[in-house]
Amino acid sequence: MAGVGPGGYAAEFVPPPECPVFEPSWEEFTDPLSFIGRIRPLAEKTGICKIRPPKDWQPPFACEVKSFRFTPRVQRLNELEAMTRVRLDFLDQLAKFWELQGSTLKIPVVERKILDLYALSKIVASKGGFEMVTKEKKWSKVGSRLGYLPGKGTGSLLKSHYERILYPYELFQSGVSLMGVQMPNLDLKEKVEPEVLSTDTQTSPEPGTRMNILPKRTRRVKTQSESGDVSRNTELKKLQIFGAGPKVVGLAMGTKDKEDEVTRRRKVTNRSDAFNMQMRQRKGTLSVNFVDLYVCMFCGRGNNEDKLLLCDGCDDSYHTFCLIPPLPDVPKGDWRCPKCVAEECSKPREAFGFEQAVREYTLQSFGEMADNFKSDYFNMPVHMVPTELVEKEFWRLVSSIEEDVIVEYGADISSKDFGSGFPVKDGRRKILPEEEEYALSGWNLNNMPVLEQSVLAHINVDISGMKVPWLYVGMCFSSFCWHIEDHWSYSINYLHWGEPKTWYGVPSHAAEQLEEVMRELAPELFESQPDLLHQLVTIMNPNVLMEHGVPVYRTNQCAGEFVVTFPRAYHSGFNQGYNFAEAVNFCTADWLPIGRQCVNHYRRLRRHCVFSHEELIFKMAADPECLDVGLAAMVCKELTLMTEEETRLRESVVQMGVLMSEEEVFELVPDDERQCSACRTTCFLSALTCSCNPERLVCLYHPTDLCPCPMQKKCLRYRYPLEDLPSLLYGVKVRAQSYDTWVSRVTEALSANFNHKKDLIELRVMLEDAEDRKYPENDLFRKLRDAVKEAETCASVAQLLLSKKQKHRQSPDSGRTRTKLTVEELKAFVQQLFSLPCVISQARQVKNLLDDVEEFHERAQEAMMDETPDSSKLQMLIDMGSSLYVELPELPRLKQELQQARWLDEVRLTLSDPQQVTLDVMKKLIDSGVGLAPHHAVEKAMAELQELLTVSERWEEKAKVCLQARPRHSVASLESIVNEAKNIPAFLPNVLSLKEALQKAREWTAKVEAIQSGSNYAYLEQLESLSAKGRPIPVRLEALPQVESQVAAARAWRERTGRTFLKKNSSHTLLQVLSPRTDIGVYGSGKNRRKKVKELIEKEKEKDLDLEPLSDLEEGLEETRDTAMVVAVFKEREQKEIEAMHSLRAANLAKMTMVDRIEEVKFCICRKTASGFMLQCELCKDWFHNSCVPLPKSSSQKKGSSWQAKEVKFLCPLCMRSRRPRLETILSLLVSLQKLPVRLPEGEALQCLTERAMSWQDRARQALATDELSSALAKLSVLSQRMVEQAAREKTEKIISAELQKAAANPDLQGHLPSFQQSAFNRVVSSVSSSPRQTMDYDDEETDSDEDIRETYGYDMKDTASVKSSSSLEPNLFCDEEIPIKSEEVVTHMWTAPSFCAEHAYSSASKSCSQGSSTPRKQPRKSPLVPRSLEPPVLELSPGAKAQLEELMMVGDLLEVSLDETQHIWRILQATHPPSEDRFLHIMEDDSMEEKPLKVKGKDSSEKKRKRKLEKVEQLFGEGKQKSKELKKMDKPRKKKLKLGADKSKELNKLAKKLAKEEERKKKKEKAAAAKVELVKESTEKKREKKVLDIPSKYDWSGAEESDDENAVCAAQNCQRPCKDKVDWVQCDGGCDEWFHQVCVGVSPEMAENEDYICINCAKKQGPVSPGPAPPPSFIMSYKLPMEDLKETS
């Protein structure tokens, strides 16, 4: 506990415990003294208590604030604390000693702390003094006691300080320094009587100041004995202690004579004067004149004049070395000899007391000062300073020697002079209506002392502080010291407003203990002032008192709260800040014995009494009718004791020899004149006087202290004769008689035994009687009231208990919460019922309930002792216990055991079926079992479950590890795990999974062994299936790595084979490509391909085409495992393929004969009718649109423009499904296949394909080895040599053409150009007619990627359009594709001999040789399917040889292998065809044909790209340069639509005419074309589905390239130039073959479709036309100009 540290400094303050706080109700608050009497048993244990009034009780502040002026007291905080004041007194004496010695006291600092000289002195004295400590070397221990750490040389330092400062003072105190010097008769330890200090002439420092060194202390010297003027109040006239409550000794209320006042005044000395005095300088030696006059008072010699000192007080001389202790040097200041020092120090000190401040304050000015001080001190607003901080700082300051804080306290201000804070009806001020309640309230401190129950009401005089309240105006740190109230009365304090007041209280039973502790800790103060604690000037830290066993309690009194102190309860405290409080004393009936004890205590201390206690008792007894009954009873008791004591004292005095007696009315004698001279007690009943001094008297307790005269001369003065005392006692007794009777009856009733107990009704009557007669609420009254209350409570509880028991039996399942009695409470209740001082009727029934409870207890104990809980038995007991409305302790236990029993039943049921015992079930059972109360059966089951769970989890974890192990565990190790876990009676999923994995592993191994033991290798699909199934099996399969390696090798071989055969993004599988075709006759691609197979076969059957459905070879290979069967199936599919191809070729060739139904015949893979430019597949003989299939590419582009003779053969994408590698590549794949221990359907298909290809190769070689075919091959070789020569000539012509172009730019050679041009043109035409055809290749643009096309054909897909469009420039073919051509480009593919035909190159060469300069005109025809008369072929073969070659060619084309023999046979067969035979169709569309989307090209193609395309077309078709020269004359690119059957000369003439005519209209059309650009763009987007149709070549449509097709001019004289989305044309059937807009000639589309049209010119030539329908036209065409041409035109 905190207190004072070793060095005298205060440690941190620890607040004591809080005192009780009471909050009375309004009913309790109506009677203050009764309420205080009720709380007294509890509150008096702590000495103080706090009472909070009801919230609505708020009395107004009634003081006149403006006129309220007061002078406060000055308080130095560190002088209040007892131990601190002792230290300060010691330092004062020490400083005074050294000042008289001519030195200034300077307190040293040790280890950065001021040395506590007082503590050092006490510690050294306790250890035997300076010599003993030095001798025994205990200075280090002294340092430890002072709180210094050892080992730093502190001991020696302390020794030097003690020897220098304290040791001389110690010698002086012991009297050694005065040995040999004659001294007057002085007692250095003479005690000083306490002195009454005058306060009206003292000056004080300003409040709130702080000093950091030694504080200044004001001292007064006593000059005369205590005397003073008193008021004329008869009771206070002779008192020396003025009033009760927190007050200070010596504050005289009267005035003094001026002479006494002046005499008592003394000069104020200040403790720091000793430090601040300016000492006059003394010379080290005396002058020569004085040497003979002064000698040393010790040695009597005058030598050593330089060491001879002269006293400044008495002028005596002393040698420095004769002094004790000797002085080392001559003092510089004033020096006094030991005799003068002893005289000065022996003067009595003035008693300590508070000074009055100089300044007078109002409440406002004092509040401003107080608030400024607190806010400045704590450096924060006053309301924000915590009370705990102020409390700790206060106790730190009062214990601090270094800091001196001065505050002011407006204490003991009489409300009689300044007015009370409560409203009072004293006539000074008018009471407002709202103040009336508070003016009459018993809690008004002006009313409380004079209440009917109060003893002080019988004192007629206003005792200031006891009957008249005192006011207290406090500030921060202002305090009131430890004290008890006068006559040990009650006190009550009310805080009107302001900051809290902190209180500390000590109960009355520890009052003497507190006094002893303070005497022990500060004996110096009590030596001079024995009644120090009655002077309110000394405080001590509560922590110090608590350390010494004194109980201390605290509280913070806030505004509007009361604090009550009880008799002889020491209390002290301080203010937290600016506040205003009011206090007064009061005495109740229970105080009378305490007051009597207080007078006896005062008698021992010789302390004055405020009033005579005996007088008060007899005054109340003189008028008993006005006494309260309770007070009368107490007065009767006190009066009886006093009568007995007074009789004893008088008898003892008479026995001592006092003979004279005389009656005297003591109440008429002033109190100061009837005080006992020995004990100062105020005498009332009797006193002893002597004739030698009639004014002097003593009480009968001190008869011998009166005077030395004999007792016979002394006279006994008495107030009442002994004979009159019984009569007074009888009057009081009569008043209290009724009360005594009531007391006896109540006592008898409360103490009666069981058989003689009263009924509850009788006790109620006694209580009502006491309340009606207002008997005092003493212990008996409270006991009766408590007994009645207890009996009533027990009766109501018993009735409630019995009634609820019945209700509970009727509704035991009610869920409402009820408060039940426990068994112990029931037993105690039954015991209480039978121990009541009265009888209640329900006691017996409650006893029966207790018997039922005990029976339940016995049965429950038996049930709980069972080895295994029985759920049915437990349930029955629970039902029984629930019916009793008692809190049975066994009931929760029974419910627990019921839960245990049900849990055990569940465990037994679960374990009976191992399949239900999963880990989760066991965990749930364990979790539910963990929450159960402990039981050996449950614990046993829990242990079994836990063990089973642990084992199961361990095996489950082991199985899980095995399942997830990498690498996998072997079968044997897993089987051992499964076998070991088989005996566990639980459901283990991982173990079962492991078991299943073992089963799968066995099955898998068996399958592998079965496959490996077979005669043939397994198929890849089988091994892949085994690998896929074996891989997830969590068992180490020995054969799995081998199987996976085989699968990987087989897959690698299949991927390599696929790269060899398959095109990129091919829709065919490798097995389909390697197997004979089963989809012959099936068209389409993608996912619908297989679906269309069956649908097309059904359609072909409906058309009576003999196409036998073919099965899938792949399915046959998968179903067949025998090698021989595979070969047989392949042969069977091969035969079906050949038959199906024969049927398909026949069906496709038959389409060409269906001229009348040509619109219904479907061609191409798109399965649409014939239209535009079409190509015929050499294998299936079907025709394909050039926009649906990729066009064949010249092989010369791949081989650097070589003119090697190779054919251009077109195979459709359906017939040519793969890359067709060479046989050498296939043989390397077969070698790799032989190394694989795996069967692949693709491998077997490849073997069969290879055997088929080699077999065909053998047949082909045999056929080519015949004489007829050998000679044909030789003839072709000769023609090939001619082609090489022709290529050389063509190169020469190119050089000549280039030179001509250069010459055209030279003006000097312009005249010679026509001849050169005509000559060059003729040579070019002849050379082109004899040039060999270039070989063509093809690919499938729907299935091949750009990269694949580049790899296979040598051109990009971006160039496909140009390649396609190249075919449209053949003059002898029908073509509706367009190629834009600029006039600046050299074009060599127009108006030449047909070169893009399916002829062998040798036939072309032969044809050029056989043809003359002019070519016979083709036969005019309306249908492109009508055969023309052809020229003779190059080779002639026999029908048998040709048929054999055609059959070999068909079979060879079916093979997906490239063989040289197919090229040889193809060349021979091409040479057998006529040179002009068409293998490409150009169909003119009518409106009934399906329109195809228009491919619009933008203008973003560069000129270089266009030129490259045209050069490729030139290389592809080998056309002459004469056409290019003519085209160079044209300004814009042109597209020509050439009609089959017109001869070249006629076409050229018409073209020349058209060019001249169009040149003239060119400029006019440019403006119109520009205006129509945007309109044509929109119409082009809307009509993308429309197809471009062919226009007869005799029209020159060069102007159309510059304008819109819709604005083209027809042959009509007044052409309207129709501007529509679709322009319909009609051709004249009269012979001129001119073309006309249907709108311009007035022909509707229906007429043009059903009738022949003859123009006006032809009609004139033919004469009048007979009426009737015109012959139907051949074709009606719809034309739309391509967007690219339009852009170029614009």
From Swiss-Prot:
Residues 437-603 form the JmjC domain. The gene is KDM5A. Interacts with SUZ12; the interaction is direct. Interacts with the viral protein-binding domain of RB1. Interacts with ESR1, MYC, MYCN and LMO2. Interacts with HDAC1; this interaction impairs histone deacetylation by HDAC1. Interacts with BMAL1 and CLOCK. Interacts (via PHD-type 1 zinc finger) with histone H3 unmodified at 'Lys-4' and (via PHD-type 3 zinc finger) with histone H3 di- and trimethylated at 'Lys-4'. A zinc finger (C5HC2) spans 676-728. The modification Phosphoserine is found at residues 204, 1111, 1330-1331, 1345, 1438, 1488, 1598, 1603, 1666. The modification Phosphothreonine is found at residue 1343. Residues 1337-1348 have a biased composition (Acidic residues). The keyword Ribosomal protein does not apply. PANTHER family: LYSINE-SPECIFIC DEMETHYLASE (PTHR10694), LYSINE-SPECIFIC DEMETHYLASE 5A (PTHR10694:SF17). Belongs to the JARID1 histone demethylase family. It catalyses: N(6),N(6),N(6)-trimethyl-L-lysyl(4)-[histone H3] + 3 2-oxoglutarate + 3 O2 = L-lysyl(4)-[histone H3] + 3 formaldehyde + 3 succinate + 3 CO2. Residues 1490-1503, 1520-1530 have a biased composition (Basic and acidic residues). The keyword Phosphoprotein applies. This is Lysine-specific demethylase 5A. It is linked to A chromosomal aberration involving KDM5A has been found in M5 type acute myeloid leukemia. Translocation t(11;12)(p15;p13) with NUP98. Its EC number is 1.14.11.67. The GSGFP motif is required for the interaction with SUZ12. The ARID domain specifically binds to the CCGCCC motif and is required for the lysine-specific histone demethylase activity. The PHD-type 3 zinc finger is required for the interaction with histone H3 di- and trimethylated at 'Lys-4'. Binds 1 Fe(2+) ion per subunit. Its cofactor is Fe(2+). Residues 1327-1348, 1407-1433, 1490-1509, 1516-1543 are annotated as: Disordered.
